[in-house]
Design a protein with these regions (language model features):
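Alpha-helical adaptor scaffolds
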Residues: 244, 251, 286, 402-412, ...
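Solenoid-like repeat scaffolds
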Residues: 83-88, 179, 209-214, 229-233, ...
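Generic helix N-cap/helix-start motif at coil->alpha-helix transitions
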Residues: 54-60, 135-136, 183-184, 202, ...
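"A position-specific structural signal for the A-helix of alpha-solenoid helical repeats
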Residues: 62, 96, 103, 141, ...
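Residue-level recognition of tetratricopeptide repeat
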Residues: 65, 99, 144, 151, ...
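Residue-level detector of the short coil/turn that links helix A to helix B
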Residues: 71, 157, 254-255, 289, ...
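Short coil/linker segments at helix-helix boundaries
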Residues: 55-59, 67, 71-79, 97-248, ...
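Alpha-helical repeat scaffolds
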Residues: 79-80, 115-129, 161-172, 212-228, ...
Length: 518
């Protein structure tokens, strides 16, 4: 009876004034159990649906993407935060976070920023890996973050890490093209990587092949060109990047400098309110002897505090003024760059230019002080920095006349440079000055479109300087090769390129060799 009574007690459930018996209890318990299971399973399903990561380039994300690629980092960051609130499962704001980290670290090179921002890349990668792999944006996003991290690693001297990240980026983009052939969103990055890998000399291609990276400069550039000029949804969305990357590749990889600047002009890029495009145009113009154009772009840009403050504005505007022999205008700008820029790139080059400006002004105390700093500050990753250090080690000040001609030529003032040098060859008795004089005249004639005269002076430069460590002979060989290649005289051009490659121990060897190989 005890056992029976216990059972009755356990099964007597009061519902209002009604007493439910064992049979009805069992039925009610069963129904409630089913409801509980259904609720539990429904909750799991609902949670899974809510937790499903998505890639949504909604209006807020598009606006944030546009702002960050104008280098308006603070407004972009606010929009990214807003997008995360709108949909915490959206991975596009996570990707855009990496853009802010990339631009700040790559352009400013501040070690203090590096300490807390660089580790964000790993967190971003981990977050993006939670996305659905059956979406082409999965590989696209990861490939972008890896290449961004690689570029930052290169700037901070972590070359091994950068190499592995470049491979990761390449492999993800390559896999995407095979898996989703209709997806064009990563044509820009994949094409750029293909083009760069395609420039690797044949003697080293075994290494890229071993790493699974095979590329073609021609096919890669074709892919990038099609994307930069494309009209599909991805080409339009990512045009802020393609209009930055494509002209750079045209200029430096293809050596099509006029085409690069023409692209910027034809696309009517906003060089006032988009600082990324303004920086691109100013930099390429400066490197194409159009320093007056550089000066105009920098001085007329939107100076709102919304934009990240780039020290390179001071450096490039200082260079542009120096090339015009505006020494008083150049000095404070170059000084500001060397004092405020936290990175290493172009510091030695800027200090050399600062020393030249003071030297030409007759302020030898300031000139010597700037030269001494070349030994103490900055890196030697760029050819310009290497050359600055090499010339500082010589301990000799350049011939003032040749220096002025050099600066005028670099700035695009060829007529003024020719007027300065013409008929004065006999004034130069030093062998190195004689070599530079012949080279400078060759460059001036080329800039003036007198190619036959230029080639004659380039040949004389090679004859005088082939066995010297100065870069003049190697550069003369490269310039002669480029003139002949444009004329269709390919075999003669190849001969000059081979001469350029054969010359050792000059400061611009890396960049000149790259151009000769291309």
């Amino acid at each position: 009876m005890k056992q029976r009574s216990a059972y009755i007690v356990l099964t007597r459930i009061h519902f209002g004034d009604t007493v439910l018996g064992p049979v009805l209890f069992k039925r009610l318990f069963f129904e409630r159990a089913l409801l509980w299971v259904a609720f539990f399973m429904g909750s799991i399903f609902a949670n899974n649906v809510c937790a499903q990561k998505v890639y949504d380039f909604n209006a807020t994300c598009v606006q944030a993407y546009t702002e960050v690629n104008k280098l308006k980092i603070a407004p972009a960051t606010a929009l990214i935060a807003k997008a995360k609130q709108q949909n915490p499962q959206n991975l596009i704001p996570v990707l855009l976070d990496a853009y802010t980290d990339f631009y700040v670290l790559f352009l400013l090179e501040n070690p203090a920023d590096y300490k807390f921002r660089f580790k964000n890349f790993e967190r971003t990668i981990e977050a993006l890996e939670e996305g659905p792999k059956n979406n082409p944006l999965y590989n696209y996003c990861l490939s972008n973050v890896y290449i961004h991290r690689a570029m930052v690693s290169l700037k901070f001297g972590h070359f091994w890490d950068a190499g592995w990240d470049i491979r990761r980026s390449f492999m993800l983009a390559d896999e995407n093209h095979k898996k989703f052939p209709a997806f064009t969103g990563d044509d820009l990055l994949y094409g750029a990587l293909q083009g760069i890998v395609g420039t690797v000399p044949k003697g080293y291609q075994w290494l890229t092949n071993l790493l699974g990276m095979r590329g073609s400069q021609k096919e890669g550039m074709k892919m990038v060109a099609n994307f930069a000029n494309g009209t599909d949804v991805w080409a339009k969305l990512f045009s802020p990047e393609s209009h930055f990357i494509y002209p750079y590749l045209l200029f430096h990889l293809q050596n099509e400098k006029d085409a690069a600047l023409a692209f910027i002009k034809d696309k009517k890029l906003d060089l006032v309110n988009n600082h990324l495009h303004a920086w691109t145009a100013a930099n390429l113009a400066l490197n194409h002897k159009a320093s007056s154009q550089t000066k105009s772009i920098i001085e007329n840009r939107n100076k709102s505090a919304d934009y990240v403050s780039l020290p390179f504005w001071d450096f490039e505007l200082g260079c542009a003024k120096l090339y015009a022999l505006d020494l008083d205008g150049a000095t404070p700008l170059l000084t500001k760059y060397t004092e405020q820029f936290k990175g290493n790139f172009y510091i030695k080059d800027a200090l050399q230019k600062l020393s030249w400006a003071n030297f030409l002004k007759g302020d030898m105390r300031a000139a010597e002080a700037a030269r001494k700093q070349i030994f103490l500050r900055g890196g030697t990753d760029t050819d310009a920095d290497k050359q600055a250090l090499k010339e500082a080690k010589l301990g000799v000040w350049p011939n003032p006349l040749l220096l002025k001609a050099r600066l005028l030529t670099d700035g695009g003032y060829a007529k003024e440079a020719l007027a300065l040098l013409q008929g004065k060859q006999q004034q130069f008795t030093n062998p190195l000055d004689k070599l530079e004089y012949v080279y400078r005249i060759g460059r001036i004639y080329e800039d003036l479109g007198k190619e036959t005269e230029a080639i004659a002076f380039y040949k004389e430069t090679i004859k005088l300087g082939a066995n010297q460590t100065a870069y003049f002979a190697a550069r003369a060989a490269l310039q002669a090769g480029q003139i002949l290649e444009k004329r269709g005289q390919k075999q003669e051009a190849i001969s000059f390129y081979e001469q350029c490659l054969a010359m050792e121990e000059h400061s611009y060897k890396n960049s000149l060799d790259q151009r000769a190989k291309a």
